[in-house]
Amino acid sequence: KLTTGTVNINAQNNEEGTANQNDGTRYTLLSNPYTTYIDVSAFLTTNSADLHSDNGAIYVWDGSSMVAKNSGSGYKVPPAEGFMIGTVGPDGTTRQIDFTTSMMAIDGTDNAISGQMMDENKAIIILKAQQEQTQSYADIYFIEEMTNGFDFLYDSEVFGSWGDNLIYSRLVDNDDGLDLAIQSLPYSEMWEKTVSLGVNAYSGEELVISIKEQTTPADLNIYL
């Protein structure tokens, strides 16, 4: 239901087991209740205490897979668009998720990254893995003030079971086995950075990995 005021929604975590199990039951389906776009960064910051520590993102369906969008993405959620979030456990815990008018954005022009000039001291590489009709993405962001370890709201786990994601990255420092859909790293270290990638491929089928989008400096060489 579209509205113009503050909206509070209860979201329940039904996940059992360890934090890294990620069996999909920590997620809740929400939608933008406003007739305007909402800024993802503002939404995540407002609700950060109620989000699962591994996620810190929303997950949207792009027609073929669930795609993570976090505070580094510059994403704006269109009116009435649905998305998933992962909330804090343990099993059976209910958290209140808030939508406020301060999250409203004028438009969604930042949704399209390719071909645009990005903010100074920010660069993006989006890797795409495709096998038959299945595809998924691993985003690498270079942003000032990020670290090589885990940065909540800027580093985000893949959605659901690891086997559903063809490609992911691992933390440069302090890798604890978390498969990341988005990893944010220091901009100033971009020219000398090595990032570990992982793939899950179906046997007997060709897997194609490519750079879907990038806004990196012209003098940066990328090797896959």
Where are these regions (language model features)?
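Compositionally biased Ser/Thr/Gly- and acidic/asparagine-rich
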Residues: 2-223
